[in-house]
Amino acid sequence: MAKKRVYELAKELNTTSKRLMEKLEEINIVVKNHMSFLEEDELEALYDHIGVIRHKDDKSNTDDNKTASAHSVAQHSSEAMKELKKEAKKAPRIIRTTEIYLDSKDEEIKEIKANDAKSQKKPEEKRKKNDFVRVETETSGLRPGLVRETKPEYMRILEEQKKSEASKAQTNEKKDAEKNSVKEVVKKEEGSKQTAEIKDGSVNMEGKVLEEVKATVADSATNVNLNESIDKDKKTNDNRQVSTDNSAVNNEENAADTLNKKDMDKKNNNKKNEAKKNAEKKNEAKKNEKNDNKGGNAKKNEHRSPDMKKNDSNRPQDANKQNSKAAADKNREEGRTGSKKSLEIPKVELTTSQKEEFNSQRAERREYNKDAEKDSKRELRKEQPRSAISGGRNKNHKVIKNVFNSRKGVSEVLSDDFEMDDFYFGGSKKSRKIKKKKEEKKEEKPAPPKPVVTSIKIAAPITVKELAEALKKTSAEVIKKLMSLGIMATLNQELDFDTAAIVADEFGVKAEEEVVVNEEDILFDDSDDPNDPEAVPRPPVVVVMGHVDHGKTSLLDAIKKTNVTEKEAGGITQHIGAYMVKINNRNITFLDTPGHEAFTAMRARGAQVTDIAVLVVAADDGVMPQTIEAINHAKAANVTIIVAINKIDKPTANPEKVKQELTEYGLIPEEWGGDTIFVEVSAKKGVNIDYLLEMILLAADMLELKANPNKQAKGTVIEAKLDKDKGPVATVLVQRGTLCVGDSIIVGTTTGRIRAMTDDKGHRIKKAGPSTPVEILGLHEVPEAGETFYVITDEKTAKQLIEKRKLKQREQLLKASARVTLDDLFNQIKEGKVKELNIIVKADVQGSVEALKQSLEKLSNDEVRVKIIHGGVGSVTETDVTLAQVSNAIIIGFNVRPPANVIDAAKKAGVDLRLYTIIYNAIEDIEAAMKGMLEPTYKEVVIGHVEIRQIFKVSGVGTVGGGYVTDGKITRNANIRLVRDGIVVHEGKLGSLKRFKDDVREVAEGYECGLSIEKFNDIKEGDVVEVYVMEEVKE
């Protein structure tokens, strides 16, 4: 195979070069243009791809293969079949319905052209255009030796069937022609004989029946012989003899017709005689019909000819059509062929005399109708509304095509009454009277009274939805009632018992509070009986409150005569301390709450567990904001307040001014007619300390403080922390009962068994009575400060309660998490784009964590919002660093020292880790960080002016102005304004700044320079360039 160019190959294949190049690209063969050569392997690949089949000139080989394959097919040997399969794989297969031959001058193709030219019109014109294209033939694409059948097997079968049907039709036509010829001959020969017999009147009704039976037998025999004679084309004389018998029957019919005409004339003349003989003829007709039905039908069916059987198929089979034509013709024939007396047959009402022909389906239907009537009669006996419907049925029943014209219940549809009445008998077409009776019966039934709610039991709190369900009202009705009462409530809003009782009363329902027994009621005994005979006096719990640096801890130090203040960092109390002081053989428990505003929550908890509050006010400072807050907390907790005016030893002290200021807040001294005890003390010098203690004991006696030490122990957690060696440690104040080592307690969401107890002086104790502060060990987790603890005995119920509390706490955390909800979306829109400062707080005790949280959250402003994403007790861990890295937060450690690996991890992650021992420093640093996050405020500062005196145009640079610095200085990359005649022409930046040929950073006043402006060339002599910078304004 020689090389070929693309355009040459395109001509041979009768296509375009572009199309060929596209086909070559499909098989990854790239050619430059239509003049490129194609190698032999490329041609082979292209032929295989586009379906071109090349045939060789060796015909002998193909002939040998054909003969060999044909011989192998004839033998059907296994070895030959294997060889055929191998050859079939190698043989060329047709890819398209048109084969393309490149060797168009071969003799074989010429022969094919000659053969095709005979069958096609104008073959010369088509072959001149493309001689190499040949249409698919019988042998194309097949194995050698095999020929494709032009007509499949099923086509042959269809043609054979058509041929056989055509031959049958021809034979039938011959039969009919021969029959007609035979009948005409027989009619002429036998016509006279038949008429003579009829005139004599010797044939009676019974003889007629016998003759008809003989005639049917003879007719069937003649048909059989006639078919044989037509098939064999012999014995024509015999066929004529047999056909005479067949024609006799037809001749009798014609004679009967002529006789019928004569009889009709006689009937018209003798009508009077007919009326007399009606009764006798009726009886004869009945007898004949009975004989016909009993014996005649069976014999006729057995000996009927094929033509008669064909006619039977067209007869109506419905027995209900009693006046059918077949029955009437039958009666006429019986009358015509009888005796003279019986020939005068009157018109008989066949509808009453003739019986129904037997039919098995009709008999079943008749039995079914009888059963239905019996069922209806049974239903009439029952006292049911359906009985009236079944009794009014119509006997002419019809099946209803569409039964979906009325609604029925499932029980009614599945009942037998529906199937009988509605489906078969047309239950939808009931009489109006029945419907009226049914409606009257329905109206007679009394409607059941609606349940009226008179009283309900509800548990407080209850949601609006639950209240509506209890009242059997809709939620909308309950909400409307609440709105009329001035309460705007939603569907899931909780209502207290009093509000729910008022709403129920508005609906005329009496509400009773349901007693709900939960795990807390089982575990805890919260009943406090003031007249308990086992109650004994207990020490008072005193809390010292006041402003920062007013001397609270110094007063406690003076009372305890121990130096506590020096131990605190910066001299400020950081934790709640609980101490017991013995005065005159009586104990007093002191709680020292920090005075800083950050510890508001801690101070609120301290006020809740105390009996007396000592308000410390400095004589020189007077009432401060934290002092007012302390007064409010004490009043909210209903605590007796004793005012201690401290620092009276100072020369600037003014106790009277302090008393005057406190009267504004409801604290009036006794000497001024009030009920508040005022004591002037000096904690530093110990002045009037004993008198203050006596006043505390006096107030305690007035309160008559008692507690039952034998009850279930109950108390409050004052402080809790996580100790490295001891684990979770909690400082608790026992308020009731006696706490012992080994008791199991439950605090919030944690439990534990007390392993050890120590008092305020560090001594190990085994029991702690009411109003005793102790430090306990053995809890599983660090509890929250302010939680109430109980001693429990049923640990199983306690675990269930803890699971409930944890679930509730988890729900609250999910609600508090910053997720976008429909309720919170409006608030976020109002806030706009708010920057957040994420902070992680770690402290040594829980109280400090809460104090830092509240202090830092108060620093939030309109542009920056402080968000405490995590707060916990203990040192900073690597987990905290990871959380800070992910959430872009800073870590604040208070009184904790992180290990070296945590500090390294924070440095690698770029997390800001800050450690503090005094809370003021932490707050100040956070404020500075927040100011850094605010968008800075800039102001414009003019640093100099340049007067343009000469202009130079430099290729590649543009216009350069030579100027003189009149004042200030000019710096590179500074902002400039080009002023021309007092009008700002352009604002931009300096592109370059030079002095002579050197680039300089700045040019001072009194020097010349050359400058260019970025993206601006319209500089003219006399312009003034104003140079300025933007400086940040510190807040």
UniProtKB/Swiss-Prot annotation:
One of its GO terms (cellular component) is cytosol. Residues 537-706 form the tr-type G domain. PROSITE patterns: G_TR_2, IF2. Residues 646-649 are annotated as: G4. Pfam families: EF-G_D2, GTP_EFTU, GTP_EFTU_D2, IF-2, IF2_N. Residues 68-78, 219-228, 239-253, 316-325 have a biased composition (Polar residues). Its main location: cytoplasm. Residues 546-553 are annotated as: G1. Residues 592-595 are annotated as: G3. Residues 56-80, 114-402 are annotated as: Disordered. GO terms for molecular function: GTP binding; GTPase activity; translation initiation factor activity. SUPFAM superfamilies: Initiation factor IF2/eIF5b, domain 3, P-loop containing nucleoside triphosphate hydrolases, Translation proteins. This is Translation initiation factor IF-2. It comes from Acetivibrio thermocellus (strain ATCC 27405 / DSM 1237 / JCM 9322 / NBRC 103400 / NCIMB 10682 / NRRL B-4536 / VPI 7372) (Clostridium thermocellum). The lineage of its organism: Bacteria, Bacillati, Bacillota, Clostridia, Eubacteriales.
